[in-house]
């Protein structure tokens, strides 16, 4: 989640059960440390030819976490069905990487409204807040014991999801013509974990983009919930898992002992059930560079550049 430059690599798409390049499981020491240098002006500050921006502030119910949400609206008129809309976690880092070149590319299709949900900080990541907000309570150990220098409180995904769906989304969508059939959610690492948990727990969104979800940080039990899904409850939702093939010297796959078999079983069951899930492989990208590549791909997908999903539990897309 950490490299600040865009990557131009396009993913090779495969059905979700292809395991050859699946590297979801990681230990803390194998994650590159985040680039925590303070951020400068972003595209909202500089201005765009293709989008206009607004910023809204929110607080958590307990008053301990404070959010800054950027809403980017296309300068083009909304289609009759409304704009697609993509909610993006780690919004500070997203806004730091968003540029007019990508916005131009989106505008050539059906440009989405972009909602970057970040925190009230000048840093790219609020490490403590995201560790709490993005991790599921059911699988939580209350603190992130794999965090190295920190022991971060975890397990707040239900509270954050309620904030996102009942306060943030209604506020930012007010007055906009939104296509609710094309409302999506993207997240990377812990954010990817939140997206996967949200796919299981909520039908507020239709498209769920989970990039490099941190299943290996003690959250692999989430796979049991995935395995148990009833397909009829997921017919209207679409899940895309995005992962990079391990680069040379990246030995994350060596930590997958005892877990890869669970993933294999889970993905096979999903395939057999005909659930609308896909796996997108990004060759030669590690965990950090997947932040840029995956959020770009999610935006392009929801804008309609890539093949559209089709409803129906037995029609696998892509």
Language model regions located:
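A domain-start/cap signature at the N-terminus of enzymes
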Residues: 28-83
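N-terminal signal peptide c-region/cleavage motif recognized by signal peptidases
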Residues: 23-27
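Serine-hydrolase catalytic machinery in alpha/beta-hydrolase-like enzymes
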Residues: 82-163, 167, 171
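A conserved short beta-strand
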Residues: 204-214
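Short glycine-enriched nucleophile-adjacent loop
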Residues: 192-201
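Alpha/beta-hydrolase-fold serine-hydrolase catalytic core, especially in secreted/extracellular enzymes
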Residues: 273-275, 284, 293, 305-318
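Alpha/beta-hydrolase fold nucleophile elbow
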Residues: 177-188
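The feature captures the conserved acid-bearing segment of alpha/beta-hydrolase catalytic domains
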Residues: 216-281, 285
């Amino acid at each position: 989640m950490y490299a600040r430059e865009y990557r131009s690599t396009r993913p090779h798409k495969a059905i979700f059960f292809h395991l050859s390049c699946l590297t979801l499981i990681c230990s803390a020491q194998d994650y590159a440390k985040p680039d925590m240098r303070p951020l400068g002006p972003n595209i909202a500050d500089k201005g765009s030819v293709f989008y206009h921006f607004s910023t809204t502030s929110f607080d958590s119910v307990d008053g301990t976490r404070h959010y800054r949400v950027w809403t980017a609206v296309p300068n083009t008129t909304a289609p009759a069905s409304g704009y697609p809309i993509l909610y993006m976690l780690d919004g500070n880092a997203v806004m730091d990487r968003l540029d007019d070149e990508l916005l131009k590319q989106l505008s050539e299709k059906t440009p989405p409204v972009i909602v970057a949900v970040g925190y009230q900080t000048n840093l790219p990541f609020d490490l403590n807040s995201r560790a709490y907000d993005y991790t599921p309570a059911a699988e939580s150990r209350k603190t992130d014991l794999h965090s190295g220098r920190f022991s971060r409180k975890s397990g707040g995904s239900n509270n954050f999801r309620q904030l996102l769906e009942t306060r943030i989304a209604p506020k930012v969508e007010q007055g906009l013509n939104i296509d609710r059939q094309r409302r999506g959610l993207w997240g990377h690492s812990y954010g990817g974990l939140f997206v996967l948990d949200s796919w299981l727990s909520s039908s507020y969104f239709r498209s769920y983009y989970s990039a490099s979800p941190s299943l290996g940080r003690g959250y692999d039990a989430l796979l049991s919930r995935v395995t148990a899904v009833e397909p009829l409850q997921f017919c209207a939702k679409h899940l895309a898992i995005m992962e990079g093939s391990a680069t040379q010297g990246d030995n994350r796959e060596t930590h997958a002992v005892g877990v890869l078999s669970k993933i294999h079983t889970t993905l096979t069951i999903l395939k057999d059930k005909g659930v609308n899930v896909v796996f997108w492989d990004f060759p030669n990208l590690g965990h950090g560079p997947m932040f840029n590549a995956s959020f770009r791909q999610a935006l392009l997908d929801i804008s309609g550049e890539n093949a559209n999903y089709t409803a129906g539990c037995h029609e696998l897309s892509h």
